[in-house]
């Protein structure tokens, strides 16, 4: 059975690139346009095995989303990848603002997404 990845990003084009890339590689993909929608999906689904989330989104940003995910008993230990620009990533790392399992920098490169995801969650 394919493993399921939740992709949370307000950019429809970024979700499309990541979603298509992962589907071609054999993953199930569920998409959300912001952190609140992502939480709503998680509350109704117990089978998501990896979360990829953007940092900057309306309604609920990526940092708040991650904090809320870590409060959910079923998802406390679920791996999370953060989508950022290189500038955002370096600021977050310097400030110890977030703990993630991996970083995916924008602009999104499909080969990089596959490398990161298959390392964390082999198909």
Please identify what each model-predicted range represents.
Residues 54, 84:
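Active-site residues of response regulator receiver
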Residues 108-117:
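C-terminal output helix
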Residues 31-50:
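Acidic, metal-coordinating helix/loop segments flanking the phosphotransfer/catalytic sites
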Residues 16-24:
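Charged docking surfaces used in two-component/phosphorelay signaling
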Residues 57:
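Receiver (REC) domain active-site loop signature in two-component systems and cognate sites
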Residues 47-49, 74-79:
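His-Asp phosphorelay/catalytic-motif detector in bacterial-type signaling
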